[in-house]
Amino acid sequence: MKTFNLPLLVALFYLFVSVARSQGPIDITKFGAKPNADATSALLAAWKEACAAAAPAKIVVPAGEFLLNAVKLQGPCKAPLTIEIAGNFKAPADVAQMKGEDTWVKIENVQGLTITCLPTGGTFDGQGQAAWKQNKCAQSGMCNSLPYNFRFNTLTNAQISGIKSLNSKLYHMGVMGCKNITLTGLTIDAPKDSLNTDGMHIGRSNGVHATNSKIGTGDDCISMGDGAVDVHVEGITCGPGHGISIGSMGKFANEAPNTGIFVKNCSFTDTDNGVRIKSWMNSFEASASDLHFEDITVTNVLNPVIIDQEYCPYNHCKEKTPSKVKLSKISFKNVHGAAKSAEVVKLLCSSAVPCDGVELADIDLTFPGGAAVSQCKNVKPIVTGKQNPVACGAPATPAAP
């Protein structure tokens, strides 16, 4: 009499069910996407199917040029999800066609997202040239009236690689409320005179790695707002733009602290700033600590190393009381190269809450036009290694707006 191995049968049954549930790649052309035509509804349909899949799913964007209007790709999804992009997308040039949306491509509330762009694809052209003329930030101080290229909101365990973001109407990328997210191999590009086209803005996120990317914009290559914790920025080539900035801090009440930020092995060419920490005058109380900048190379940079606690762009500060943002445990190590101005180091700290625990180590910065100077105010840094120019050789003067 034959006997049956019940545990084996049960295992085979569940294996069969798992295989039955799995599916091949979900190609957006399955939903009607065609090159040189609008792929918005097709991408949304592909996302809906992939997000509902019980097993890990993959969305495929084949080679070709596609038009894309504003999309929201929202979770939660039932399983991890991958988007593989061989094609390229263009946004509407006319911002009115985006119907008031604050973002071109918004992805949010997803665990286990992977975006991989093949060498031939992954270009997202925001076509921001016309929109930049509508930017009234300098006049009104209202700087969020145009859409980002991307917002990555509340993503957990995400891997994003190879995106090429061009000509965003406002910021290229926002990373908000994320946990354990890596963004690598990015190309971010907009002209140096494009207003407020920050390459990447990180806020209220924990465990962010931004690595091995080339960023050239009309604003900060990377900026970090409040609540940026355990952020690692490494291997970034920045220029043109305004450098890599922590802040501006203190503009709003109840900002979350910034802590554990590491910027390493980055180079800056033809930028307004290199590495910068900034907080508003007449600010609310806030804090930032454990901020470290190391192995920094500058070429023709206006302010290679700067702490600016008298930040007030466009002269919009009605009062000019000292900043209440407390800065502590900060280091600048192995910073070298040639500056565009004589003021190569400017540590302009608040008189209300002077900076604590600032370290300058192995600074070698020159100004081809004459003698370089290191300026300090309301700070007594710890100085080690080579110091060219002499650390804190002059009092700090206000930074250029």
Curated annotation (Swiss-Prot):
Keywords: Allergen, Cell wall, Cell wall biogenesis/degradation, Disulfide bond, Glycoprotein, Glycosidase, Hydrolase, Secreted, Signal
E.C. no: 3.2.1.67
Entry-linked InterPro entries: Glyco_hydro_28, PbH1, Pectin_lyas_fold, Pectin_lyase_fold/virulence
Keyword Hydrolase appears in the UniProt entry: yes
Gene3D superfamilies: Single-stranded right-handed beta-helix, Pectin lyase-like
Subcellular location(s) per record: Secreted; Secreted, Cell wall
GO molecular-function terms, A-Z: galacturan 1,4-alpha-galacturonidase activity; polygalacturonase activity
GO cellular component, one term: extracellular region
Catalytic residue positions: 219, 242
Listed SUPFAM superfamilies: Pectin lyase-like (SSF51126)
Chief site of localization: secreted
An annotated GO BP: carbohydrate metabolic process
Catalytic reaction equation(s): [(1->4)-alpha-D-galacturonosyl](n) + H2O = alpha-D-galacturonate + [(1->4)-alpha-D-galacturonosyl](n-1)
Functional note: May function in depolymerizing pectin during pollen development, germination, and tube growth. Acts as an exo-polygalacturonase.
Family that this chain belongs to: Belongs to the glycosyl hydrolase 28 family.
The protein, known as: Probable galacturan 1,4-alpha-galacturonidase SALK6
